[in-house]
Amino acid sequence: MVVRGTIMLVDKFIDLASKAIGDTNVITYPKELEKYSRDHSLVKPGIPSCIVRPGSVEEVQEIIEYANKLLVPITPLSGGTNNLGGTIPVPNGVILDLKRMNRVLDIDVRAGMASIQPGVTFEQLQEYASKHGLRALTPVELPKTSSALSTYLDLAPLYGWVYYGEEILTTMTVLLPDGTLLKTGQQAFPQIKWPYVHSHASPFAGLMNYIWYQSQGTLGVVAQGWVKLKPIHEVVEAFFVTVNDDNDLYKIAREIMWMRYPRDMVIFNNVDAALFFEDETPNYGKKTAELIPSLPKWVVAFTLRGRKEGVDIMVSDIAEKLQGIGYKLLDEVPGMPKAKEIFLSEVNYPSGWPKYSKYRGARTILPFICSLKDVPIIHQALKKFIEKHGFSTNYVGVTITPTDRVGVVACNVAFNREIQEVDKIRNLYYEVAEEMLRLGAFYSRPYGILAKLMYSRAQNYYEVLMKIKRTLDPNNIMNPRRLTLTEDL
């Protein structure tokens, strides 16, 4: 059952929170609350009663304890609203905005690790890491202003997945729904620094972290975590392969992934390629629309990093492999002379969905995991549903993120729409989501409609999740909209 705080209890919570963290950090202005009530997803809007912005672990702990006692629902938020519906609150609930907790607490250069708070953005982490000869792994769909910690916790697709894998967050500090502080892995032990590698930067956290991965704020608040950083190599080059056949795309992507050379890799259809490579100017929407028809069906983009002689060998190997299947390795994308420069810049400081949304006004994402070999049939099915609903294929973007498991990819299908086209998109989105599931898609981050689709088909899995939820959060205060089959969407 979803807990909904009564007006009296919410008012008492606001009073207690104001005393704990100061009036200026408890926001109740209607215009500000409205900003947090919706995003580009199809999740039903919900206006919070207030926004609280704690500045320390202790303040977060106090806020959670008050909410638990007064049965006031809390929705954690780290880096601004997203476009998947995960941070839309229960009506009259509370937004726990963690953006004031924006410090890089520690760094272990030798281990390639940094300890960060949830308010640290990718832009901030990248700038900090670069001073130490390191770099952060960045997300494909999210902007540089997103929270690094929550992105890694949510296992959102990263450009670097193809080489470095999905688990970038290691040990962490969690505040449970009753305010109890819990530390995973070696963070639970006393800290040991030089001459040894920082013990808290150890990548070994056991299986406990998996409880909070992709938990969508339903099982507590991650207030700090150690994340992996990667070296800045001597040579960094970007390369492209353009493809016009779905079946060839599978062969090309598989061969490149199998070689284990790319350090960052992504595949765009012509729509998302145009959105990605077009400069963000006042005429962005018009120029993007003009660019889409001129682009190849697919653009495979990746980086090669290392010493010069090593990169030269990798380039030669990939070019030879592609030549064997009738394709060329390109330095630029035809018709886009700045593609290399833009790709390298975006991998470091991504623009993400806020930029892409300027094409038509909004961008509704359908994210899933699937087998690389299923991409051709999934893409063909997608086109059929687009045509059935009278939606233009020039409005539907597809971005594929390869993983380090050759044959497994993350897909984002993006319905670029006008703000008022919610009802038009809803039926198309639902039918496509059902068909993708039938064809082998797995919704690892199920929000809104996707949660109902997944959990209703995996009752045993859902019951295990609910057992964990009832154990850790018996009062159901933490983001209660996320784990439900009955939410009015």
Name every feature range the model reports, one short phrase each:
Residues 104-107, 116-256:
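FAD-binding subdomain of flavoenzyme oxidoreductases
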Residues 26-30, 53-54, 74-78, 96-98, ...:
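General beta-strand structural signal in soluble alpha/beta enzymes
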Residues 13, 17, 67, 252-257, ...:
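Short amphipathic alpha-helices in soluble, non-transmembrane regions
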Residues 1-65, 82-112, 147-155, 275-278, ...:
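N-terminal flexible segment immediately upstream of the FAD-binding catalytic core
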Residues 57, 245-247, 304-311, 371-375, ...:
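Helix N-cap motif at beta-to-alpha junctions
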Residues 236, 242, 291-329:
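A conserved active-site cap/scaffold subdomain adjacent to cofactor or substrate pockets
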Residues 41-42, 46-47, 72, 79, ...:
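Conserved glycine-rich FAD pyrophosphate-binding loop
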Residues 248-284, 375-391, 425-432:
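Short amphipathic alpha-helix segments
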